[in-house]
Amino acid sequence: MKTAIYPGSFDPITLGHLNIIKRAAVCFDKLIVCVMVNSEKVNRGLFTPEERVELIRRVVAKLPNVEADCSSTLIAEYARQKRACTLVKGLRAVSDFEQEVQMAMINSKINPDLDTVFFPSSEKYTYLSSSVAKELARYHANLDEFLPREIIDDVKNKLEIRSDECDGRQR
């Protein structure tokens, strides 16, 4: 069984991420979308890592060979634990390539059995990031072209709670 891992922060998962997930899912027997926890950023995200995993599970529910998980270990070690042979990485721009190749080389030093494959972003998602989606949501923009419909209300509600907290209002 060929298992691949698509690591990222996914705060939140976007339609660009989902596009990569769907394309990668047809290439592997099993695809694990793994929320990577950066200890330096653990309290700075919109959603907790556990909430992100739950959002991803809802979004990929109809993809039978895709699952969501969370890890705070090195991705190369996590891949070894899961017996994964491949990391999936999305590239939005040429500028992403240099950093991702460096990371791929480091990961293969840690886990020589691990390859990295790159999926170029679909043209309509090259500009899209979780940060862009969150910023648009803060200003009540239509999110249909940015986020999976299953999670739009979650993002809006979370931002509303954050806004209330910043304004000193209680919910």
Model-identified regions with their sequence ranges:
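Nucleotidyltransferase catalytic core that binds NTPs
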Residues: 1-171
